[in-house]
Amino acid sequence: MQLVTTKDVLKEPPGRQMTNRLRIVAIDGPAGAGKSTIAQALALALDIPYLDTGAMYRMVTYAALRDGIDLQDENAVADVARRMNTVMSADRFFVDEVDVTDIIRGAQVTEAVSIVAALSEVRNELRAAQRAWVKNAGGGVVEGRDIGTVVFPDATLKVFLTASPAIRAQRRVSQSGGDVLAIEEQIRKRDHLDSTRADSPLRESKDSLFIDTTDLSIEKVVQQIASSVADIESSSHE
């Protein structure tokens, strides 16, 4: 299990010196595009660690709600991010020694996380934590919404996944239940918030591998990404 504490992370900016030494695959995309499932499968295929940065924003949201913090108070929420201790593995998440794996995927956190994710101070704290995690882990598959554009712009490979809102809603329903039309509306709202926020909005990097997963299996997508990584690494050794 990987301990991530925003109190003692290395404040090292991203750059070629770090990313060129490490195998980093950045996977970005909107909610429900298959990022988590594909990123986890890819990490297993490549035998490197996996980091879910979306879970980090959810953990901050949970902690802020727990403490009764006004989510519009940027300084207060950022202070929560700095103070909290988190333990993360591939499938379990702990905040201050409490297992929040299921809680952070619940409706309350899901409805509020886009507010927290739009706060620049919070994003700065978590970016530093993400860079430190990857440096300590020796690389990894990192998924989120600004990984290839901001956190690791010089990643080995940058991937942007998407799918139609209807398909993304169906996937969420199959995972967690709920009304498909209501979830599709939530997804569309989240897309708008993510793509229009002032700090690192969701967008495709110019040099990313774009994959529409609407009609593709997980295995097919993982195979395509792994093949691209192999091609890049092979050409770099020629």
Question: Can you describe what each PLM-predicted range is?
Answer:
Residues 1-24:
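Extreme N-terminal, non-catalytic leader segments
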Residues 27:
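Hydrophobic anchor at the beta1->P-loop junction of P-loop NTPases
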Residues 30:
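P-loop (Walker A) phosphate-binding loop of NTP-binding proteins
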Residues 35:
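Conserved lysine of the Walker
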Residues 38:
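Hydrophobic positions on the alpha1 helix immediately C-terminal to the Walker A/P-loop
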Residues 90-91, 130-138, 147-150, 154, ...:
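Small-molecule kinase domains that catalyze NTP-dependent phosphoryl transfer to phosphate-bearing small molecules
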Residues 101-176:
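ATP-dependent NMP and nucleoside kinases share a basic, alpha-helical "lid"
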